[in-house]
Amino acid sequence: MKRLFGFYPMMAMIIAAMLTSGCSSDSDLDFFNQGNGNETGNGNSGNENSGNGSSGSAATYNSSLGDLTDFDISIDKTALSESETIPTEGDEAEDFIENNSFKSEVDIAFKGSSASTSGSVDGVTVTINGADVVVKSSAKKVCYNVSGTTTNGFLKIYSDNKFELNLNGVSITNPDGAAINIQSKKRGYIVLADGTENTLTDGTRYSDATDDEDMKACFFSEGKMLFSGKGSLSVYANCKAGIRSDDYVLFRPGNNIYVKATAGNAIKANDALYIKGGVINVETSAAASKGLSSDGLVQIDGGRTTVLTTGTGEYDSDEQDVSGCAGIKADSIFVMNGGALFCKSTGAGGKGISCDQLLTVNDGTIKVITTGKQFTYGRLDTSPKGMKSDGAMYLKGGTIMVRCTGGEGSEGIESKSTMNISGGNIMAYCYDDAINSSKAMTISGGNVFAMGTNNDGIDSNSTLTVSGGVVIACGTTQPEEGFDCDQNTFAVTGGTLIGIGGTTSTPTTSVTTQPVAILGGSSIQNGQYITVADDSGSSIFAFKVPRDYTQQGYTLLVSSPKMTKGNSYIFSLGATVSGGNDFCGYVTDATVSGGSSLATLTLSQMITTSNFSGGIGGGGMQPGGNGGGPGGGGQPGGGWH
């Protein structure tokens, strides 16, 4: 949240003078102990979780946030047991080797500084010079079986027709260029023979390159790269990308891919990158490098994909702009339909997922960590983000966990356009805004937890509409907010909302159809429970406050379908809460005892306020409520707009 100088400092001084001053599991969900083999609980959590509040004082956060504050991401090559349905009709069927037949076979065996071939097929010529192997083919239905080891060779394929490339325990190192270079625009069915280990390594320079041929990666193809098989492939790229296609790339269940790239992107596709399944691990260390990148679509349907990037940002003189690393970079669309995606970026300006157009999550598990700071070059800068789209973002299902701790600009989930959340379990814990949209934000379902340790929990730079789901937004102290939509329309028509921060945006009375209570107070401590009960004392829910609000007060916004207009509700602090269902400190169906009363509110209006610790009142923008401040205008203590 950006503020004009002078306004909030003055308000903070007035309010300070007048005041007396995570996540475990829901009933059917277990967010943090999913057994994916990718959470090692590193020792950095102490540094990451001791971020300073806006006032400069240290803040601590309670254990109710579970693994959100300390989960780690690391390379995991453990195989997965996955089922697969092979399509037999439509355009997709052509990409599956099971729907093709390659009966003519050519064997190529590398041995040290030499290579040999066997199997004669009309239309296929194999030329060998030492361990440099060049295949030229006009034949159809050919399978090339490749095995053996060389530390000074390569395989190049020219083919007029689609073919099978069977990697059957091969290790190729080419000090002068690509290890495998496919100069064919036809489909290449790349089979990792079951149980085999295959390794490709390039050199630090590509002196084998010619002016009329591309050589863009350690494993490069002009055509489609369609992977299958239950073997492994390790690619070590020292000059350019690891795996690259000038068409599209497809990975399937059973594939076990590892790419380490030190000078470029790990895996790059021009048209699209499809992950149907398998285990994909990539590491990049070059400046502004990408783990998985496509000029078009990136679509993940299954498997487990892990991306680690460590490079810093860089200035691009051609674009006259700066960019950082990204675990996933889609120049058009990113879609997640299933499987697991883990991204960790530690360099300046690094991002987890970056999408230039539409970003959609339908299902699956996404975990993102960024720890780098903002990258600057002169007056240009790029900030770390967990998930970022320049176009619209739709979060419809699955589980998303994002932690960004690198300082200013480290936002969790950001859309430069509209954001729509309709399902799933979404948790963001970030230094800057946890969830942010430049245009309208709509939340109609799902479980959402958003915590900005030095800024807002949820920040819409346009309208904000909540009609369903559980939405918890935690901002830091003055002038930051739990819910922030500047002075735009804020509609509450359903769902459970809990917002806490130094201040809050006010729901708009004319479009709000579910009662909202706003309370201002002087002090509340990390780990204390705020409880809400009806006038008979029956608990509606409890909320475990995730940080201290002790210096400049706090503002609490609450709304629930169980809180209806005309009825009274008891707000208490410091109760003992046991049992029940817990989502990031929001607890239902629990046993609640003790605590001291904060306020009893009768929800006589759509917006009811209480300044229970003597905060100032407002000027009539919203109706006053029980216990309202002087003037009865409905501005709760702690400061808000």
Question: How does the language model describe each region?
Answer:
Residues G6-F7, S24-H641:
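A composition-driven surface/loop motif
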Residues M18-G22:
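C-terminal motif of bacterial Sec signal peptides marking the signal peptidase cleavage site
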Residues M1-M10:
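Bacterial N-terminal signal peptides that target proteins for export
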